[in-house]
């Protein structure tokens, strides 16, 4: 079988910003409340003293360049290596990019997880924002996989488990990443996963829908490619399924050569079936369900048997064990049964033997309820811009007093809560919610249609994971639905207020190189520091071309204000010890060594979900081992 190379694709350009209401509130007010908060919910503060960063860091090579600046490797006086991202404020051209940058800094500075890139410090002056981040020395996961014909299952599980742990932590705190891909997953010096690039991340709420069509084409979910609203976590689950397929099989699940074929395959869930099935096939099938309601959640993945095979605890139980809890033998057997019941969910559609087995051996396996239907493609419904949309009213800000988008004034300090708009036409009174009928006799409001082509069309060069993701796109100006929280049924929405079209621009990258064409012939606006809320926007200095950045301009000899980041909780250690997998290997003959994946036969799989008898045998063997351990 000819191996299909991994394709590098750029990101879908996010749609026009309708997020001014939702994103203007501090991150602390919008985080999901929990009895044991995993993050400190504090605002970003300012130090009232200046810093000359050239005296604090020794700058080494440049890691990458982007639309807004560059990322450099640097060494502190203590010897610690860091990655420093510089953002030039005169490159920020619209409200949408402003919200992405501000949200990325707020979210990443609040997250504290061993597998997420940490922000150490943030500095700002009148012309630049400088972000000091954790440095991942071994590059990204794309290069790591490309250098190897195929990862063995143990290594694939090791990487995937760390990705799931970080993403599960984000979802527990109400954060959706929305741009998971190999290029945004870095490796540190110890070979551990570090997820980067939260430029497209956002907060999500149950019962409300997001509508930004963003992400990378080969990792985009059916909701994204078809322009349907989504809650958020289901988009990450789909991308996680694509990542698992790549880790296990070494190829992309969908054909990225042709746009029409790619959209059709994603919409129907018709991924390429490997010639050599893996034990993870059931989990891949569950994650790549077209119906988002039936798609595996991060809770399902964290408790799946394949993810936890060879580990003493499930991902969701690590925090409890760290605090002193100890699972009993009965709970271990129940966990094993739960893993198999969850992992076999997609298999129950066609496996009568498995259904009968669970009815006999697993309590509740034959519970009543709606039967599992055969997976099918979602019909191509009316595009989201054919529907009438509504903005969710924010109690902290009245949408009836929101001016038009073109009249918004950009704030001087982009990390500070924005002041209310001071000018623009105001639409008097909220519009009444009106359901939209899909009957042929009733006309649908005339709203610009989503393009039939172009969403996933053009390929982009690959980017560094330190960069934020959205890029310009030929079809970007046609994607008008921004990140809007829509409550209730997405079919019952009202039309948003018509506004001028914003330019779609990347956050820190355009084809991996610094762009000069976007600002030619224009006078870019600049932004002041955080202590200035409103003042006339000065024009850029005429002595420096708008598209040029000198080698020393990242810090030069300027003074910066340091921003006080939220305090972080101690990191949660990941545990590992002798497990069921280790005990099983004691009874097996020594392995003859790893073979090429195309040389292995189907019978080499020790626990394939395609064989019901193997499932039964492995389950009984695992129960026997658990009873001996208890």
UniProtKB/Swiss-Prot annotation:
Keyword Membrane: no
Gene3D superfamilies cross-referenced by the UniProt entry: Transferase(Phosphotransferase) domain 1
Residues that bear Phosphoserine: 529, 550, 553, 579
Cofactor(s) the protein needs: Mg(2+)
InterPro entries: Kinase-like_dom_sf, Prot_kinase_dom, Protein_kinase_ATP_BS, Ser/Thr_kinase_AS
Modification N-acetylmethionine occurs at: 1
Region called Disordered, residue ranges: 361-504, 521-566
Biased amino acid composition, Low complexity: 464-476
Keyword 4Fe-4S applies: no
SUPFAM superfamilies to which the protein is assigned, alphabetical: Protein kinase-like (PK-like)
Tissue: Expressed in liver, skin, testis, uterus, ovary, adrenal gland and brain (at protein level). Expressed in kidney, heart, skin, spleen, lung, uterus, liver and the exocrine and endocrine compartments of the human pancreas. A kinase-inactive isoform also appears to be expressed in the skin, spleen, lung, uterus, liver and testis.
UniProt modified residues of type Phosphothreonine: 212
UniProt EC number: 2.7.11.1
Catalytic reactions on record: L-seryl-[protein] + ATP = O-phospho-L-seryl-[protein] + ADP + H(+); L-threonyl-[protein] + ATP = O-phospho-L-threonyl-[protein] + ADP + H(+)
Activity control, per UniProt: Activated by phosphorylation on Thr-212 by STK11 in complex with STE20-related adapter-alpha (STRAD alpha) pseudo kinase and CAB39.
Active site annotation, chain numbering: 179 (proton acceptor)
GO terms (BP aspect): actin cytoskeleton organization; apoptotic process; cellular response to glucose starvation; negative regulation of apoptotic process; protein localization to nucleus; protein phosphorylation; regulation of hippo signaling
Transmembrane parts of this sequence: none
Domain of life according to the entry: Eukaryota
Modification after translation, per record: Phosphorylated at Thr-212 by STK11/LKB1 in complex with STE20-related adapter-alpha (STRADA) pseudo kinase and CAB39. Autophosphorylation is also possible at Thr-212.
Class of the enzyme per the UniProt entry, highest EC level: transferase
Record SMART domains: S_TKc
Family of this protein: Belongs to the protein kinase superfamily. CAMK Ser/Thr protein kinase family. SNF1 subfamily.
UniProt function note: Stress-activated kinase involved in tolerance to glucose starvation. Induces cell-cell detachment by increasing F-actin conversion to G-actin. Expression is induced by CD95 or TNF-alpha, via NF-kappa-B. Protects cells from CD95-mediated apoptosis and is required for the increased motility and invasiveness of CD95-activated tumor cells. Phosphorylates LATS1 and LATS2. Plays a key role in neural tube closure during embryonic development through LATS2 phosphorylation and regulation of the nuclear localization of YAP1 a critical downstream regulatory target in the Hippo signaling pathway.
Name of the featured protein: NUAK family SNF1-like kinase 2
Organism whose genome encodes this protein: Rattus norvegicus (Rat)
């Amino acid at each position: 079988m000819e191996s299909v190379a991994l394709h590098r694709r750029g990101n879908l350009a996010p749609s026009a910003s309708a997020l001014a209401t939702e994103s203007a509130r501090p991150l602390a007010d919008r985080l999901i409340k929990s009895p044991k908060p995993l993050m400190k919910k504090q605002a970003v503060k300012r130090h009232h003293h200046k810093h000359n960063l050239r005296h604090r860091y020794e700058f080494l090579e440049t890691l990458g360049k982007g639309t807004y600046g560059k990322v450099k490797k640097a060494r502190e006086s203590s010897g610690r290596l860091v990655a420093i991202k510089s953002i030039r404020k005169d490159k920020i051209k619209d409200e949408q990019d402003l919200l992405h940058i501000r949200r990325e800094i707020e979210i990443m500075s609040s997250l504290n997880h061993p597998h997420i890139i940490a922000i150490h410090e943030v500095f700002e002056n009148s012309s630049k924002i400088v972000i000091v981040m954790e440095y991942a020395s071994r590059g990204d996961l794309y290069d790591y996989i490309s250098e190897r014909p195929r990862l063995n299952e143990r290594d694939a599980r090791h990487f995937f488990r760390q990705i799931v742990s970080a993403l599960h932590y984000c979802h527990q705190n109400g954060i959706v990443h929305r741009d998971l891909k190999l290029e945004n997953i870095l490796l540190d010096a110890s070979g551990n996963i570090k997820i980067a690039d939260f430029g497209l991340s956002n907060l999500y709420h149950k019962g409300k829908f997001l509508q930004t069509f963003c992400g990378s084409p080969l990792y985009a979910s059916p909701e994204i490619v078809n322009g349907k609203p989504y809650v958020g976590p289901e988009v990450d689950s789909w991308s996680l399924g694509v990542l698992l397929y790549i880790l296990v099989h070494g190829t992309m699940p969908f054909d990225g050569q042709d746009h029409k074929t790619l959209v059709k395959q994603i919409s129907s869930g018709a991924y390429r079936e490997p010639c050599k099935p893996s034990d993870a096939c059931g989990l891949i099938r569950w994650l790549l369900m077209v119906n988002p309601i039936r798609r595996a959640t991060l809770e399902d993945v964290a408790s799946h048997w394949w993810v936890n095979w060879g580990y003493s605890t499930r991902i969701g139980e690590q925090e409890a064990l760290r605090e002193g809890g100890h699972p009993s033998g009965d709970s271990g057997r129940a966990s094993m049964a739960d893993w198999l019941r969850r992992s076999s969910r997609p298999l129950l559609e066609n496996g009568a033997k498995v259904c009968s087995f669970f009815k006999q051996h697993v309590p509740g396996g034959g519970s009543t309820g709606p039967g599992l239907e055969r997976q099918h493609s979602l019909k191509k419904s009316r595009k989201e811009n054919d529907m009438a949309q509504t903005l969710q009213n924010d109690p902290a800000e009245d949408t009836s007093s929101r001016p038009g988008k073109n009249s918004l004034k950009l704030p001087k300090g982009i990390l500070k809560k924005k002041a209310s708009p001071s000018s623009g036409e105001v639409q008097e009174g909220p519009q009444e919610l009106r359901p939209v009928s899909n009957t042929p006799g009733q006309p649908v409001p005339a709203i610009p249609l989503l393009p039939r082509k172009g969403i996933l069309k053009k390929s982009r060069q690959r980017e560094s994971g330190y960069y934020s993701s959205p890029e310009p796109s030929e079809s970007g100006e046609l994607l008008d639905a921004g990140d809007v929280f829509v409550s209730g049924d997405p079919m019952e929405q009202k039309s948003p207020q018509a506004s001028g079209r914003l330019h779609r621009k990347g956050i820190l990258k355009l084809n991996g190189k610094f762009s000069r064409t976007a600002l030619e012939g224009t006078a870019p606006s600049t932004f002041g520091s955080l202590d200035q809320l409103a003042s006339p926007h000065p024009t850029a200095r005429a002595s420096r071309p708008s598209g040029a950045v000198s080698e020393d301009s990242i810090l030069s000899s300027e003074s910066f204000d340091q921003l006080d980041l939220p305090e972080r909780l101690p990191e949660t250690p990941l545990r590992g010890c002798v497990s069921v997998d280790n005990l099983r290997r004691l009874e097996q003959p020594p392995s003859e060594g790893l073979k090429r994946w195309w040389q292995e036969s189907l019978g080499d799989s020790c626990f394939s979900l395609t064989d019901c008898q193997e499932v039964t045998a492995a389950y009984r063997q695992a129960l026997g081992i658990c009873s001996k351990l208890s």
